[in-house]
Design a protein with these regions (language model features):
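Catalytic-site microenvironment of enzymes
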Residues: 8, 33-37, 52, 132-136
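A structural motif corresponding to the C-terminal end of an alpha-helix
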Residues: 12-18, 58-59, 106, 133-140, ...
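Loop-centered beta-sheet repeat module
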Residues: 41-93
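Conserved mixed alpha/beta catalytic, RNA-binding, or beta-rich assembly cores of soluble enzyme
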Residues: 78-165
Length: 234
């Protein structure tokens, strides 16, 4: 089954020392794979969903909530606040038996800026606006930025430019941005699902290729080194 295949993949990643992350889409699957996941995401279209907020409240990992597709930050802020509190919801036990699950709340949830139908929101001005909204609600003000989706205007080739802007913010001393999300694969682009697939090429969203990914990661790493050097000088 799909859960078994996913678990086997996560175990292989773990054995190589690579932490696994995923987007959680329902309240059942996590019971089978959550112990193998290091970080989780709730997508823009489900951030407003009460059951996903309840789910996040019981996950033993940091969970990122994306801003809404309309650009609304408040939807994600409300989700983070809600998920920090205890909840009860219908799910299954680890043995697959239907049960009422009780949670203690997840204080490690955070915001993901992913852009919107109105345009990108990765620049310094939008980051400051997001931090202010998070601080006003008294919650974690550290932010992840999605280099794809609305922030790339759905053009995967623009992801390096988005990452370069984020790197500049980091180089200038910003510590609000703690992570980025990149749609990346071995081979750039995407392909339709067929019987003749190219290994390492996405069958969903278009991705940057591995060489470009390495360049983006080095740009971000260099920015972190510059920020660290500035702090040591101060």
């Amino acid at each position: 089954c799909a859960c078994l295949v996913g678990s086997e993949m996560c175990i292989r990643d773990r054995d190589m020392g690579v932490p696994a992350a995923t987007e959680f889409l329902d309240t059942i699957t996590p019971q089978y794979i959550a112990d193998l996941i290091t970080w989780g995401a709730i997508g823009a279209r489900t951030t407003e969903s009460q059951v996903h907020r309840e789910l996040a409240s019981g996950l033993s990992m940091p969970v990122g909530f994306k801003n809404g597709t309309s650009g609304s930050l408040q939807i994600a802020v409300d989700a983070i606040v809600s998920s920090s509190c205890p909840h009860c919801f219908l799910s299954v036990t680890k043995q697959g038996v239907s049960a009422i699950v009780s949670t203690t709340g997840n204080k490690s949830c955070h915001l993901i800026l992913r852009g919107s139908s109105l345009g990108p929101n990765f620049d310094e001005e939008h980051v400051k606006e997001a931090v202010a909204a998070l601080q006003k609600s008294g919650i974690n003000n550290r932010i992840m930025i999605d280099c794809s989706h609305g922030n790339s205007c759905k053009d995967y080739r623009k992801q390096p430019a988005v990452a370069a802007n984020i790197a500049e913010q980091i180089s200038n001393g910003s510590d609000q941005v703690v992570a980025v999300m990149i749609e990346s694969n071995i081979v750039e682009g995407a392909q339709p699902l067929s019987s003749d697939l190219v290994y390492g090429k996405s069958i969903t969203d278009q991705c940057i290729g591995w060489e470009t990914t390495e360049e983006v990661l080095e740009t971000l790493a260099a920015a972190v080194r510059r920020r660290r050097a500035k702090r040591q000088e101060a």
